[in-house]
Amino acid sequence: MSQEIVIGGGKRTPFGDFGKSLKDIPLSDLATHSAKATLTDTNIDPVDVDHLVWGNVLPVDPDGFYAGRVAALNVGMREESCALQVNRACGSGTQAIITAAQQIMTGHSKIALAGGGENFSRGGFVNQKMRWGAVRGAQPFEDSVEWAYNDPFGHGLSLIHI
């Protein structure tokens, strides 16, 4: 089944220095901003979008775990529309585009919106032992941002293989 897929336009999420101007902005707000700008520039009515696919490595806010769905509803997509969040390390945004194209190619969507973004400035410190009660000794906190940079496959390898 061959079908032409068209990328109608695109906007990027804002880009800033770690801990500076974007440190207080939730990931879903960044997703909403780029999705809304893309829809405006392409003159697409949000109610016509069937699916939003969002790529993200480090969900740093309560609504960051499903930032794509939050953004979909924020921009005015139908409640019946679908959303999906993908994590493929550094290739998450690229995977979002691929997955959105697959939604169209398989007939699951006529119009799909794809994007990706991070806000590492909002990454927290984690203590995995405290939930179940640490018994003794020092209980250090780990920087979740470091997890993203030091994943077991090395920074950037996922994108190379997509």
List PLM regions with ranges.
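Generic secondary-structure signature for well-ordered alpha-helical cores
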Residues: M1, T13, L39-I44, L73-E80, ...
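Conserved active-site "lid/cap" helical segment
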Residues: M1-V57, D61-A71, V75
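Short glycine-aspartate micro-motif
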Residues: I7-G8, K110-A114
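Glycine-rich, flexible loop/turn motifs
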Residues: K11-P14, F18-S21, E80-C82, S121-R122, ...
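Acidic, glycine-rich active-site loops and adjacent beta-strand->loop/helix elements
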Residues: K11-P14, G55-P59, R88-S92, G116-S121, ...
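Conserved catalytic cysteine-centered active-site region
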Residues: I25, N56-A112, F141, E146, ...
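Short, flexible, mixed-charge acidic loops at enzyme active sites
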Residues: F65-A72, N127-G137
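Conserved small/polar residues in nucleotide/adenosyl-binding loops
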Residues: I160-I162
